Amino acid sequence: MQYNTLGNTDLRVSRLCLGCMTFGEPSRGNHAWTLPEESSRPIIKRTLEGGINFFDTANSYSDGSSEEIVGRALRDFARRDEVVVATKVFHRVGDLPEGLSRAQILRSIDDSLTRLGMEYVDILQIHRWDYTTPIEETLEALNDVVKAGKARYIGASSMHASQFAQALALQKQHGWAPFVTMQDHYNLIYREEEREMLPLCWQEGVAVIPWSPLARGRLTRPWGETTARLVSDDVGKNLYAESDKNDAQIAERLAGVSEALGATRAQVALAWLVSKRGVAAPIIGASREEQLDELLNAVDLTLKPEQIAELETPYKQHPVVGFK
């Protein structure tokens, strides 16, 4: 596994981050396809054995049970100073309403730390932009979380570049803790972040940690082939349904490049993303150990410029999706 420094922080992270939405009690939350604890623990253990030290979860994943499962596994399989743990706040969980008010942030971080069984998280991220709370209130509350030692850093996820620029400017103006990561929607078939968000992150030294790097499984198999999860994944359908025809052309080229390299589609799609400027660690998901082993090898795969061009050329502008 390769490692790099995460943006303007002192955190040394693996070039891949394990996304933990897959882990959670199926009876809790709105994802019936998640893995219960007994199935999640072997994957988390194998992740650590494979060199990944970066884990991303959220308060709302499976109504908090993702944090519980991940926290117990990391306590059993690793020392706290060996891992980098990120979680999120915004979405509704339990009786905590959706939003980023001061009260919601301060309660959410305490609840997350309790579920994780940790004294602090390395990164607390805002999951989405809150249109009902003044951004100054949100940013000051996040700063207070850092000052209290409950989070070492703060990050953001999926928003308009203009919103992110506004937040960064306010943090500078007030001397508040800055956002150090942007978790955005970025993969071979969704590259809208290249227009404004990625240049902003480069300029500000913000590390990019993309979600859905394999387009929720669409870049791992022949186009049109389905799985039980794809059939039941309403979020994925909303993200990619409108661009299906154009995306199929990219998937065909991905298959060709993969065959030429003797690699899998997933490995090539990840290698492409890892090669992009500013991308610190794509957030991968795995529901089986063999899936994880396949993805671990992607960071050692180097694409030639002509192969990158082959993959990128068919791309056409997409509707902005993943946030409002």
Give the positions of each predicted feature:
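Active-site mouth loops of central-metabolism enzymes
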Residues: 24-38, 92-106, 127, 132
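Active-site beta-loop-alpha junctions enriched in small/polar residues
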Residues: 21-23, 58-60, 88-92, 126-129, ...
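Beta/alpha (TIM)-barrel catalytic core signal, keyed to glycine-rich beta->alpha loops juxtaposed to Asp/Glu
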Residues: 133-313
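N-terminal binding-site loop/beta-alpha segment at the start of enzyme catalytic domains
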Residues: 1-83
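Short acidic capping loops at alpha-helix termini that bridge into adjacent secondary structure
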Residues: 14-15, 80-83, 87, 119-123, ...
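Active-site groove signature of glycoside hydrolases
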Residues: 113-133
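Short, acidic/polar
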Residues: 33-47, 100-116, 164-169
